[in-house]
């Protein structure tokens, strides 16, 4: 009897230890698969149209990832995220072929915030989350500035802290883009960490935002330094500006706000970009991007949202206005179908493309474009 009692006690103790260990650490597998069929008018200089399955995104870029945490006690925990982007139409890896191109970091979380190390989003991307209504959609802000939905940096150290609704964020990269084809089209790579050149290919960004139950405001600043193979693309058909010197700067400043009430949400903001070069032969360039959007749940399962964008680049004499409308029907908590359409009007010299679906749809100068897509999205 004593032997049986002892065995039961040992078994119970092991179960208790196992339960405690499980409570102290966890790893979550998650992902999104999003694709569909798209039509784009005037998709080349000859005015031809295209039907296709886009490579990059629909409502959201497809991805899978692992997210984990370990409780270290005293309010501290170790955290990590490994997130891989992929293209549904052919199964290839995104972000220049990186295995974990969307995010790959490890860090420490505590009562005073989180510090993390690795490939991470910059503060530009994080600060826009509240006000940019349709986000990284195929007909979103990325059509006019493709860096915005791809604002990540290799070799980065970040800090995020929240207190009574305020969030302070900061990031610093020792070399922002060291693999693949660059974080956005035409940007080039910029590996950095070169001996004797402490600022080459650096990226630093800061963010301050405030979120209340029914509204929020945010501001951010990001500065990229030049280096070998670095460029600045304005996505308007003009050749990218070379940023070969560490003194060259590509800076983005952003302010935005949002409000929400009873199933409705309204957001608006401004994103200013300034490229300043160290060479008198290379002109400085600036652009200003304005946006306003709204969303409304008509029923708990039916969402309608849309956004209007306006970009002005006075140096290139290029301007564009784009409007997008999207409807989403929720089949379940994890699956949905959607239909969306957008129209982009280019000024006489501009060649912005309405679609952020992976290139190959640049129109002739001054020509407008229509984009239409129907798709399906599943989250796990």
Regions found by a protein language model. Name each.
Residues 1-10:
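Bacterial N-terminal signal peptides that target proteins for export
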Residues 18-21, 26:
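N-terminal signal peptide c-region/cleavage motif recognized by signal peptidases
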Residues 25-39, 51-177, 200, 209-216, ...:
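Outer membrane beta-barrel
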Residues 28-30, 77-79, 114-118, 167-169, ...:
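Residue-level detector of the transmembrane beta-barrel scaffold of outer-membrane proteins
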Residues 41-50, 92-94, 175-201, 224-249, ...:
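Solvent-exposed loop segments that connect transmembrane elements
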Residues 60-64, 102-108, 153-157, 202-206, ...:
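Hydrophobic, lipid-facing positions within transmembrane beta-strands of outer-membrane proteins
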Residues 199, 206-324, 328, 340-341:
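Detector for outer-membrane/organellar transmembrane beta-barrel domains
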Residues 331, 366-380:
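Outer-membrane beta-barrel "beta-signal"
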